[in-house]
Amino acid sequence: ANDTDVNTSGGSITINGDVVGSLVELDIDTTANSGTSGTIKITGDITAKTGGGADEILVLNAGSGKIDLGGAVGATTSALKSVTLSSTNTAADAVKLAGNIKTSATAGAIDITGPVTIAATDLVIDADQAATTVTFASTSTVNATSAGTQGLTINTGAGNISMGGAIGGTTKLKDLSINSATTGAGDITLANIGSSTDGVHGATSIGNANTGTINLNGSVYKTVGSQTYQASATGDDTGNNINIANTVTFTTTDTNIKFETSDVELADNVSLTVTTGGSTAGDIEFEGSIHGTTGGTDATHIAGLTSGTGTVTLNAIDTDIEDITITNASAGSTILKGNITTANNGVLSITGDTKIGADTLAIDTTAGGGGSVTITGKLDSLTTSRNLDINSGTAVTEITEDIGDVVAFTTLDINAVVGDNTNTGGVTLGGNIGGTAAGSGNTQIGNTKTTGAITLSGTTYFTSGTLDFKSNGVGGSYVINNASDVTIKTTGVSTVTFGTNDLTIGNAKLTIDTDPGDTGANGADITFGGNILGASGGVAADLELDADTADVIVLGIGHDGSNDNNEINDVLLTGSD
C-alpha cells in the first residue's frame, strides 16, 4: 500500500459512489493557489480495506471550498486510524456530513475544521476502540439541517474530545451525547450549546463516571431537553473535574440540569446561572460540591439557581464564592446536603422552602465581616431530624416562614457562635418554630455579642429542648412582633431563657410554658435577664409565665428600671414556692 495524493489546484472533485482503498494515506486537496478553492464531494461511503492494516489515514482539504460527504467514513470494522476534514469556508454547511465516522483500533485522531451541518438523521462519531482524539476547531460550529431532526453522538475511549465551536447555535440538534454511553476516560471540552435560541431539542448528556475532566469554556448552554454533565469523582483534577471557565448561563425548558459525580470548580471572576424555568418543572442537582478558585482575586458568584416548581439539590459550596442566590416557585424546594461558606461578605438568599439533608450542616457567611442569610419560605429537616447552624457575622439572618413544622431539627443554632466578637448580626423569624409538635430540640438564637435585634413574628415557638435567646447587654434587643397571641413552650424539662436586654411584646398575650398541658413533668426555669415591656401605642398585653414547680426569674415587668411602661395588662406567674 502507498500514499495517494489528489491535488486539483482549486478545481472541484466529485466522486459518485464509494471510495474503497488499502492505502497508508489518501489525501485529496482542492486548495487553490489563488481565488476560490474547489469542492470535495463524495456521494458514497469511504472505507479502507482491513487487509491493509488498521492505520490508514484520510485527509480531505478543501481550502475555501466545501466538503460534502454523502456516506459513512469508515465501516463497521474500520481500518481508518485518522480522519482530517478541513475547510476555511464560513458557510454553515462548509462541511456536510450525511454518514457516520468510525476509526480503527489504532490510536489516531479525528480533526474537523470548518462549520459542520449534519445531513443524516443522526451523526455518530465512533472512536471508542482506542485513544483516538476528536477535535472540532473553533470555527467548527455544529448544526442540524432541520431544527430538532438530526442528533450528534461522539464516543471515544481514552481519547480527548474538544468542541471548539457552538453546537446548535443556528439550527438546534435533535439530541446530543458525548461519551455518555461509554466508559471512556478522555477529557471533554465544550464551547457553547445553543445561543439566544435552543441548541438541542432533546436530551444533552456529556461524560460518564470515568471522564477525566469536562471543561465548559462557553457562556451559554441552552436546550429544550435535559442537560447532564458527569465526570470522575477523583480523576485528573483531584475531584474538581467539571470546570467552568467563564460567566455562564445553563438553561432548559421544564427539564432537569444535573452535574453528576464530580465537584464543580468555578474560575475566578465567574458568575454562574442555572435555570429550568421560573414557574415550571425541572430539577437542578449538583451531586458534588461547588468550589471557587483558591487564591482568586475577583468576585465569583452563583448568580441564580432557578428551578421553578422543581428541586434544587446542593452539596457543599465554598472556596472564594461570594453571593449565592437560589429561587424556587411555591411548589419547589431547595435541598442542602453540605456546608455553605461564602467569602468577602457574600450573602445567601433562598426563595422557596428549604430542607436540610445532612446530619449536621453549617451555613457560614461571616468571612469579611458578614453577609445576610435570607430564607424566604419554610425551613425543615429532610426525612429525619438534622442539626443546623447558621452564622451570618454582622449581618441579619432571616427565615420568613415556619421552622421544623414538617420534619423537626435535632438542634438549631442561629448566630449562636460568639466567634471573634464579630458574630453580632440580628435574627428575624417570620414564622413559627414547630406547630402542634416541637420543631427543634435544643435551640439557641443569638449570642452574648449579638447587637442586632432578635425579632419573633410567629405565634408558636415550640421546642423539645432548651430554648435560649441571647444578646449583648448594650445594643441588642428582643422583640415579639405579632398582633395575635404568642406561645413559647418546651418539653422534656427544658428551660426558656432570654439573656441580657429587654423583651418588648406586641399588643396580644404572651404565654411561656415549660410544662405544656400540666403533664406533671415539673417544668423548667423561665429566665429573663432584662425587663418585659409592652409595645407602646397599642392595647396593653397580657403575660403568662408558667414554669410549673421550677423558677420564674425576671428583672421587671412593665417597668424598665427607671420608668413605668404602662403597656402590660394581666400578669400570671406560676413557679416554685
Give each language-model segment a name.
Residues A1-D577:
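Extracellular lectin-like interaction modules
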